[in-house]
């Protein structure tokens, strides 16, 4: 049967102590509610209804690219009242999957199983057994059938001993749901309209109510404060790490690895501790990544090595290249095979040719370096005059001496040499030597200044 989805995301989230809506706080660098939306898309829902109540502008800015029905809950009168706001978008002849917006680790296969259970029942609930159910709604059963969900504050002492709890997620027929919602009342300790009361209504009508459970309790754990946010983040990251290891990636410590985007991997990759992956990163085979590296929207080819404490952003690293330690490749940095960038080298909009190297203490911006060139320590390409950026071209086999400044626009020819300490402002032809520095003068008999006694 066709189904639509209602995501409850109207809570104030006061315990987060944040000006940002709770459901926009990130898990793996993505808003938690976006993760739920992405999961729902895998199931083929006919429509997604988002019930919101606070900071609408922030929510729409973050989630506006999704095809959503926006359902405003102006007053926070309970979960039943929240679902009522989506009623105009619910059809009688479809099932309705109700989800909570603060449980981002829910899996598509768990929701698929829940929908399958609904095919053989009138109502399907997602429940879970926990060691400490304090504060949670208890599942009341008669045999295999669920007869009610009792909120903790309304539960008797005997009911509070039950460890099977409500997750807030369920599937109901649209026509039945609308009828039950219309009959809700707020005669309870909280003075709210409980969505859970529809379960008792269904039971009183003799409806068949079945339950499904997730593979892991973490799938349905909600987030109400920063401590829980951090715990869910770590659980998510460890889950990603386990998946990568099953794909053949060696993680020296899977508890100290962060994937905040997507990664495409080859074989025999070794990743040290505290590596962060952001955006979309593609890593070839036989790649080694040292500790404390940040890789964002990069491509790293087979056999490359990224040494410790290096940062790569929108960079392309060719086969058997070496980067770092302490290197920074900014957007537009391209290294061809067997090139090397060493410690404290920064590249931006720069191509480093096959076998070329800049081993230390260098800035290369808006630069093209040919094949087999050597860039000495302390070399700077002066690419910005305060208004415009200009290019530097360094030819094949060129040798740039240490502590040189190449003032763009400038071109260094093939096999040309620049003497150490030079400030080069004009073209250096192929195989020429350029020396652009003050002539050394030695003063004999010179006396150092001394401090007065």
Swiss-Prot record:
Residue segments, region N-acetyltransferase: 248-453
Keywords carried by this UniProt record: Acyltransferase, Cell shape, Cell wall biogenesis/degradation, Cytoplasm, Magnesium, Metal-binding, Multifunctional enzyme, Nucleotidyltransferase, Peptidoglycan synthesis, Repeat, Transferase
Annotated signal peptide: none
Any GO BP annotation: peptidoglycan biosynthetic process
Co-factor binding comment: Binds 1 Mg(2+) ion per subunit.
Superkingdom, taxonomy of origin: Bacteria
Location of the region described as Linker in the Swiss-Prot/TrEMBL record: 227-247
EC number: 2.7.7.23, 2.3.1.157
Cofactor: Mg(2+)
Sequence positions that bind acetyl-CoA: 377, 383-384, 402, 420, 437
InterPro entries linked to this entry: Bifunctional_GlmU, GlmU-like, GlmU_C_LbH, Hexapep, Hexapep_transf_CS, MobA-like_NTP_Trfase, Nucleotide-diphossugar_trans, Trimer_LpxA-like_sf
Compartment(s) where it occurs, according to its Swiss-Prot or TrEMBL record: Cytoplasm
Active site: 360
PROSITE patterns named in the record: HEXAPEP_TRANSFERASES
UniProt similarity note: In the N-terminal section; belongs to the N-acetylglucosamine-1-phosphate uridyltransferase family. In the C-terminal section; belongs to the transferase hexapeptide repeat family.
Stated name of the protein: Bifunctional protein GlmU
Gene source species: Pseudoalteromonas atlantica (strain T6c / ATCC BAA-1087)
Gene: glmU
């Amino acid at each position: 049967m066709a189904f639509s989805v209602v995501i409850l995301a109207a809570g104030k989230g006061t315990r987060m102590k944040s000006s940002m809506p709770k459901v926009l706080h990130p898990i793996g660098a993505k808003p938690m509610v976006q993760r739920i939306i992405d999961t729902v898309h895998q199931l083929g829902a006919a429509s997604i209804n988002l019930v919101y109540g606070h900071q609408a502008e922030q929510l729409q800015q973050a989630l506006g690219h999704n095809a959503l029905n926006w359902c405003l809950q102006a007053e926070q009168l309970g979960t039943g009242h929240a679902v009522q706001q989506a009623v105009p978008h619910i059809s009688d002849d479809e099932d309705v999957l109700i989800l909570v917006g603060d449980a981002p680790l829910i899996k598509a296969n768990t929701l698929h199983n829940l929908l399958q259970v609904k095919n053989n029942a009138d109502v399907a609930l997602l429940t879970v057994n926990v060691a400490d159910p304090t504060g949670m709604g208890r599942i009341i059963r008669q045999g295999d059938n669920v007869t009610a969900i009792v909120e903790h504050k309304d539960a008797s002492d005997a009911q509070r001993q039950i460890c099977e709890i409500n997750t807030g997620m369920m599937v109901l027929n649209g026509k039945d749901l609308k009828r039950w919602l219309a009959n809700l009342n707020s005669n309870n300790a909280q003075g709210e309209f409980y969505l859970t009361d529809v379960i008792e209504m269904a039971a009183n009508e003799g409806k068949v109510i079945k339950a499904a459970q997730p593979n892991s309790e973490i799938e349905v754990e909600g987030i109400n404060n920063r401590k829980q946010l951090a715990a869910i983040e770590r659980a998510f990251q460890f889950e990603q790490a386990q998946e990568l290891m099953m794909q053949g990636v060696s993680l020296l410590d899977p508890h100290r690895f962060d994937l905040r985007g997507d990664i495409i991997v080859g074989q025999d990759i070794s990743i040290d501790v505290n590596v962060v992956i952001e955006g979309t990163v593609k890593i070839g085979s036989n790649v080694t990544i040292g500790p404390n590296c940040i890789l964002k929207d990069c491509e790293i080819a087979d056999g490359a090595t990224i040494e410790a404490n290096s940062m790569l952003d929108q960079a392309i690293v060719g086969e058997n290249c070496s980067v770092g330690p302490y290197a920074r490749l900014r957007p537009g940095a391209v290294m061809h095979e067997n090139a090397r960038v060493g410690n404290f080298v920064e590249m931006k909009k720069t191509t480093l040719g096959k076998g070329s190297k800049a081993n230390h203490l260098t800035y290369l911006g808006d630069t093209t370096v040919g094949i087999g060139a050597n860039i000495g320590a302390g070399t700077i390409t002066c690419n910005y005059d305060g208004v415009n950026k200009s290019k530097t071209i360094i030819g094949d086999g060129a040798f740039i001496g240490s502590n040189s400044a190449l003032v763009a626009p400038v071109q260094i020819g093939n096999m040309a040499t620049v003497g150490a300490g030079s400030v080069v402002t004009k073209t250096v032809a192929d195989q020429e030597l350029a020396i652009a520095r003050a002539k050394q003068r030695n003063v004999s008999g010179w006396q150092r200044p001394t401090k007065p006694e």
